[in-house]
Design a protein with these regions (language model features):
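C-terminal substrate-binding/cap subdomain adjacent to the FAD-binding core in PCMH-type
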Residues: 1-98
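Conserved glycine-rich FAD pyrophosphate-binding loop
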Residues: 72-213
Length: 213
């Protein structure tokens, strides 16, 4: 499944009555990094849908989901240890941990816009994406750049009402690029006033979760 198809699969599964507890999409290059052989050896993108609960209920819901998603691609079930390993890898974003040269962004966007936003960003620079939360959370690993591609990332994310946070980059990049989504105008003023109200001396987590004004 390509990224757009993966987004549709996640949205359809989450919108179904089958109590899906997790939905993630691994493009082919990312899936190939998994330690789960069945995932890594396929040579294709993988959309993972998690179902939990009593065994009879899980079996019934899996069957229904496979029928629902069959038009989008082949479906297989992943059980016990392999399933746990895959979801742990996704949670920990383990696929992007090896190459320390790449810059890591965490994007929050409307799920239906996830693949479009990521592909727009990746059109102009090398990198990989990992989609979680049904496409609403995107982890981007981008090639090293002096500004971590911040303008492109934030423009694409802002266009759909999302926000972006730079999670990993060298100190030299962090010195010139805001780690958190810049808060300008009234929103920035409100944030500053609230913080000053309960922390007038600025001793509680300075610079955490937003840039100082």
């Amino acid at each position: 499944i390509y990224d757009h198809g993966g987004t549709k699969a996640m949205i359809d599964a989450l919108a179904s009555p089958h109590e899906v507890s997790g939905a993630a999409h691994l493009p082919a290059a990312v899936a190939g990094l998994s330690s789960v052989d069945y995932i890594a050896s396929g040579g294709c993108a993988v959309t993972a849908i998690r179902v939990e609960g009593p065994e009879p209920s899980v079996a019934h819901r899996c069957e229904a989901l496979r029928a629902l998603l069959a038009p989008l691609g082949d479906t297989e079930e992943l059980h016990s240890k392999n399933s746990q390993t895959l979801w742990r890898e996704i949670r920990d974003v383990i696929y992007f941990s090896e190459d320390q040269e790449r810059h890591i962004w965490r994007l929050s966007v409307p799920p239906k816009e996830g693949s479009r936003v990521a592909l727009q960003i990746l059109e102009g620079q090398p990198g990989e994406a990992l989609y979680d939360w049904g496409g609403g959370l995107i982890w981007l690993a981008l090639g090293a750049a002096p500004d971590a591609c911040a303008d492109v990332v934030r423009q694409c994310v802002a266009a759909v009402g999302g926000h972006a946070m730079l999670v990993r980059a060298p100190a030299s990049v962090r010195e010139r690029v805001s780690v958190f989504e810049p808060q300008v105008g009234p929103l920035g003023d409100i944030t500053s006033r609230i913080k000053e109200g309960f922390d007038p001396n600025g001793v509680l987590n300075p610079g955490r979760m937003h840039e100082e004004h």
